[in-house]
């Protein structure tokens, strides 16, 4: 007996009727069953009836599968698909604001709906796609009323001076000041169209506009006196942020007053000694400049612990002047730092642009001075003591010689410049020949002046570095052979 076995591929008898394809189906985890009504008037304005019966005197469009709870533009949606005769391979979704469908193999997404009005209605559709490329002909749909979120603007952290850093409740600047802020809009930062700023007054006509993606502005030629800066932003729907201002009495960590100082003379004294709370060193430099230049013929800048947030302001402050006298701390603690290293780029630009710099760094936190390259460096007093009557000789003229008038109780440096980096180099002071108790050999330099070649036909300004302290915050230190004012008299009469 022969038995024939066969397998019916089609699993039904009538081969003339092909099997019916099962299309995939799509589901959203959120199911909305309400209806929103919309109406457009003759001027093109759209009105909605949400969670209320529409006025029967008008013709309304109906938006089904809607939520009547007003939400924000940030929407997190989840979905899934099923296919009885195959496998769901992905999904296509589209918002009512989109012109095309977008494919994804994910089953969730976070969306920021591009709202352009204070209140608008958006619908979301998603349909599954199976392994044969078939698509759900009836996408799952959701309609959402979305309210515009107001944008936010706040000053960048530390972009305004802290009272702790400047040692005062008043911030003093020269006529250039940069303000920096951060922008945020829940509806997407691209919806922020305008930033407005004002000085001293917030009247309707007092605001100036810049583009909505700007996060800073540099104000120049600010008039001397007390000022307040205001800034706000606006989104495409017309919603505005709260006004941010500096100074702000509600923020007691920041400076509580902003004073713009006039630019006096073409010489700037930079006080980089925050621990000199009594300003004894500054008073000494001021008195010296009164003698050399005359009163009101120079300006001074008390930096405190931190430079301005924007290097643009540092550069601008220096460039107001022809010559800068920058003195650093005699001795720092962990709570205070010199700032000249962080000003390096601005100092280099100043010198290369023709400005003259005298700088007196004592506590060397870094020796890679771009503005004065060093070949080598030694500690003159490893025991931290440089005693009185030690002579500092000038190879230029012995009448310029200085000597230690009060104990220098910090470690100080001698150095040798990297001559290959300079177009010209002049030693102004070196240590006298050592005796048996001294910690140096030979005559290490302690004050030198260099100049760079910027172009084949142009030289830079002159930069002078002095590594012995001229003042310790209590008294001058190099007055044992006459006042050290003679150093500055020489510089201003012969070099600067």
Regions found by a protein language model. Name each.
Residues 274-275, 331, 364-366, 434, ...:
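Short, solvent-exposed loop/turn segments at secondary-structure junctions
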Residues 37-39, 190, 275-281, 436-438, ...:
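Short, solvent-exposed loop/turn elements at domain surfaces
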Residues 277-371, 376:
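Helical hinge/lid and interdomain linker segments adjacent to catalytic or ligand-binding clefts
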Residues 270-272, 360, 466:
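Short hydrophobic segments within beta-strands
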């Amino acid at each position: 007996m022969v038995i024939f076995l066969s397998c019916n591929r089609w699993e039904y008898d009538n081969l003339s009727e092909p099997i019916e394809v099962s299309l995939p189906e799509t589901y959203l985890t959120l199911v909305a069953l309400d209806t929103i009504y919309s109406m457009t008037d003759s001027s093109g304005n759209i009105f909605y009836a949400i969670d209320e019966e529409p006025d029967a005197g008008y013709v309304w469009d109906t938006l089904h599968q809607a939520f009547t709870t007003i939400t924000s533009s940030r929407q997190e949606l989840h979905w899934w698909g099923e296919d009885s005769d195959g496998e769901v391979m992905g999904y296509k979704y589209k918002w009512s604001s989109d012109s095309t469908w977008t494919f994804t193999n994910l089953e969730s997404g976070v969306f920021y709906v591009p709202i352009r009005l204070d209140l608008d209605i958006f619908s979301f559709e998603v349909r599954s796609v199976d392994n044969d490329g078939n698509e759900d002909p009836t996408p799952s749909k959701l309609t959402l009323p979305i309210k515009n979120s107001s944008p936010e603007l706040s000053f960048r952290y530390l972009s305004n001076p802290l009272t702790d850093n400047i040692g005062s409740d008043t911030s003093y600047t020269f006529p250039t000041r940069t303000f920096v802020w951060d922008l945020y809009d829940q509806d997407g930062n691209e919806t922020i169209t305008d930033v407005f700023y004002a000085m001293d007054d917030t009247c309707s006509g007092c605001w100036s506009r810049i583009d909505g993606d700007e996060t800073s502005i540099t104000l120049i030629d600010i008039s001397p006196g007390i000022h307040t800066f205001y800034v706000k932003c606006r989104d495409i729907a017309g919603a505005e942020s709260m006004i941010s201002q500096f100074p702000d009495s509600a923020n007691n960590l920041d400076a509580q007053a902003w004073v713009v100082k006039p630019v006096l003379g073409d010489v700037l004294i930079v006080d980089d000694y925050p621990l000199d709370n009594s300003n004894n060193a500054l008073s000494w430099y001021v008195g010296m400049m009164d003698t050399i230049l005359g009163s009101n013929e120079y300006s001074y800048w008390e930096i405190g612990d931190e430079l301005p947030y924007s290097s643009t302001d540092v550069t601008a402050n220096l460039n107001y002047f022809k010559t800068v006298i920058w003195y650093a701390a005699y001795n720092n603690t962990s709570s205070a730092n010199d700032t000249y290293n962080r000003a390096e780029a601005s100092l280099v630009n100043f010198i290369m642009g023709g400005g003259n710099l005298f700088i007196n760094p004592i506590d060397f936190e870094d020796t890679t001075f771009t503005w004065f390259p060093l070949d080598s460096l030694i500690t003159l007093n490893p025991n931290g003591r440089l005693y009185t009557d030690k002579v500092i000789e000038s190879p230029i003229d012995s009448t310029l010689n200085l000597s230690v008038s009060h104990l220098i109780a910090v470690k100080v440096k001698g150095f040798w410049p990297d001559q290959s980096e300079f177009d010209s180099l002049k030693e102004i002071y070196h240590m006298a020949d050592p005796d048996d108790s001294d910690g140096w050999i030979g005559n290490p330099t302690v004050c030198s002046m260099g100049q760079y070649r910027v172009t084949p036909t142009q030289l830079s300004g002159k930069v002078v570095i002095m590594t012995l302290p001229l003042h310790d915050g209590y008294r001058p230190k190099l007055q044992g052979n006459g006042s050290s004012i003679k150093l500055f008299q020489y510089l201003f009469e012969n070099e600067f």
